[in-house]
């Protein structure tokens, strides 16, 4: 019988909700299977598409969008945001030997990789990356100690109850009910959204979409009553981008679904000048309510009275 791994305690069959076990062959992910006999084979790039046969009503980020995002992020333009997230995760996981991390809406896995690398060398983390884009999961599957799953965040997550210590939710849908289910009591969720002024200077020239002014309040509402907002941090990054980098910035986000790539590339090339913008983000740190601890405190107060 195959030895159980930490990941076997985090995954759940999307068909019957029994636990999923990961089978590796020659060190690479090969199959996911449950006791009821449901089986999912890994794609040759190492990710698993659990939406097979179900599909989704949402549009995945395409190959060009994902390639633009990978190139832009790997160039280090948003490194300050990754460092801020790494610092927070390192702080909340201090003393954990085998923490479990979920990146819900992981994209290429850039932030997940940076966060895992920020943990002490004595830590042996396991991670799950979820995203609706199979093109993104091809890249996220390369993050060490990570299982990459194609999945729709608005559905019940293919994950076990209370399986994760930390959850990352970066520029992605906030399924607060499911986030609360899969986080352990007292676990931490880090939600990143753009500030209203994010990239405002380049909105016209780059064809970017507008940003709602009330995103912070919307996140709190979406996370629900099982989470308490414990900290907020704003990160601003001034950027000076040449035409190729500006093209990648425009194509990698939601506007990439609507832009004409060649028209944008030609417009930026003809202009020739650098694009000056400021990336602006808000990190909201939430703690999942630990009802057992609350009850214990109440009982302690009652007995002392």
PLM feature spans:
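N-terminal auxiliary segments of SAM/dcSAM-dependent transferases
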Residues: 1-58
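Conserved Class I S-adenosyl-L-methionine
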Residues: 7-9, 233-304
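Class I SAM-dependent methyltransferase Rossmann-like catalytic core
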Residues: 57-84, 88
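Class I SAM-dependent methyltransferase SAM/SAH-binding core
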Residues: 100-103, 108-156
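A short acidic, Gly/Pro-enriched loop at the edge of an enzyme's catalytic core
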Residues: 154-166
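Helix-to-beta-strand junctions that scaffold the AdoMet/dcAdoMet cofactor pocket
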Residues: 183-184
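Conserved beta-strand signature within the Rossmann-like core of class I S-adenosyl-L-methionine
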Residues: 187-194, 198
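Short alpha-helix
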Residues: 212-226, 253-262
């Amino acid at each position: 019988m195959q030895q159980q791994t930490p990941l076997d305690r985090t995954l759940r069959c999307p068909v019957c909700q029994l636990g999923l076990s990961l089978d590796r062959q020659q060190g690479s992910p090969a199959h996911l299977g449950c006791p009821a006999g449901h089986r999912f084979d890994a794609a040759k790039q190492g990710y698993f598409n659990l939406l097979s046969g179900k599909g989704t009503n949402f549009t995945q980020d395409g190959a060009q969008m994902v390639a633009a995002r990978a190139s832009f992020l790997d160039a280090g333009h948003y490194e300050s945001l990754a460092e801020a997230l790494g610092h927070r995760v390192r702080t909340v996981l201090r003393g954990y030997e085998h923490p479990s991390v979920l990146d819900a809406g992981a994209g290429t896995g850039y932030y997940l990789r940076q966060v895992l690398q920020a943990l002490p060398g004595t830590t042996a983390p396991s991670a799950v990356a979820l995203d609706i884009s199979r093109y993104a999961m091809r890249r996220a599957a390369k993050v060490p100690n990570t299982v990459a799953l194609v999945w729709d965040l608005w559905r019940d997550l293919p994950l076990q109850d209370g399986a994760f210590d930390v959850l990352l939710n970066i520029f992605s849908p906030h399924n607060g009910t499911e986030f609360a289910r899969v986080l352990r009591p007292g676990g931490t969720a880090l939600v990143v959204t753009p500030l209203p002024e994010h990239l405002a200077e380049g909105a016209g020239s780059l064809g970017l979409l507008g940003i709602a002014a009330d995103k912070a309040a919307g996140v709190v509402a979406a996370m629900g009553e099982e989470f308490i907002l414990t900290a907020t941090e704003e990160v601003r990054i001034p950027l000076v981008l040449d035409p190729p980098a500006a093209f990648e910035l425009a194509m990698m986000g939601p506007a990439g679904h609507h832009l004409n790539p060649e028209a944008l590339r030609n417009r930026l090339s003809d202009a020739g000048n650098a694009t000056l913008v400021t990336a602006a983000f808000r990190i909201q740190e939430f703690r999942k309510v630990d009802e057992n601890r609350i009850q214990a405190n109440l009982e302690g107060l009652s007995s002392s009275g």
